[in-house]
Amino acid sequence: MDTIKIFNHGEFDTIRNELVNLLKVVKWNTINSNVTVSSTDTIDISDCIREILYKQFKNVRNIEVSSDISFIKYNRFNDTTITDDNMGYYLVIYLNRTKSLKTLIYPTLETVISSSDDIMFSKSLNFRFENTKREYKLVMCSISLIYKPSICRIQYDNNKYIDISDSQEGNNLCYCVITMDPHHLIDLETMCVLVDKSGKCLLVNEFYIRFRKNHIYNSFVDICMDHIFELPNTKELFTLCNDDGRNIAWDNDKLESGNNTWIPKTDDEYMFLSKLMNIAKFNNTKFDYYVLVGDTDPCTVFTFKVTKYYININYE
């Protein structure tokens, strides 16, 4: 995210009442302007905050929310450190969404950003709170964001870009560039498939030439049996499996059943695929080995080099 993010659509309304209820059991110190609470209740609230933030930040691998929640009593000159930890951001949630309550943030000496909405900002920024009605309270907690490594970004339509990543986390499709080791049963060097989290495969291209028909296979094994082997009635001759029970694209704990497979339909989607193909064509130095074994005597071994590009497209 940028150094400041303003939440102006009531994103935290679902937990605002929980914070108000927690406030009722807080014993205020009349000297200090804030008090920090950490309990089972705050852990639950922190989990809720984390889920809300995951919906706001699409390119994030991990979000941590401190279980220490600070209730702030208004002090218009309070720009001191609220929490002592290594997390990079403050999140401010107003218990009462009155417009007279403001957070003032100073990105530079000459610039001030004023907001009466819930707000998240870098701890490196100077800030203070401003309000004339001292009975209003707010909540602050610390946030840590870890972003997914991104290879690049590709335009998906006029208003949206898709991050191309080498991380499975937070993504739902994998574009696999598959190179086959030489074998007498295979007359094909390279093909590319899109694999969803159920393991279904959309055959995209061979030799980097895109198919015009969208053919969905239930698994990569089915592609091998139905498409790449130079034999008729292959299924009657042998069956294939990976001895380790691995999927070609996903760790087993990332697999999900019942997913629909993304199929390109619009010009924008086909253009996106073409751009993805071009990037993969010139950026395939990193690969994993994937092995399928046929139950022949002796066994037949097929070895594939697989370069993986993970993306997240909303298509359900």
From Swiss-Prot:
Induction: Expressed in the early phase of the viral replicative cycle. One of its GO terms (cellular component) is host cell cytoplasm. Disulfide bonds: none annotated. Keywords: Early protein, Host cytoplasm, Host nucleus. The keyword Protein biosynthesis does not apply. It is found in: Host cytoplasm; Host nucleus. Its main location: host cell. Belongs to the poxviridae OPG031 family. Plays a role in the inhibition of host NF-kappa-B activation. Mechanistically, blocks the subunit p65/RELA translocation into the host nucleus. This is protein OPG031. It comes from Monkeypox virus.
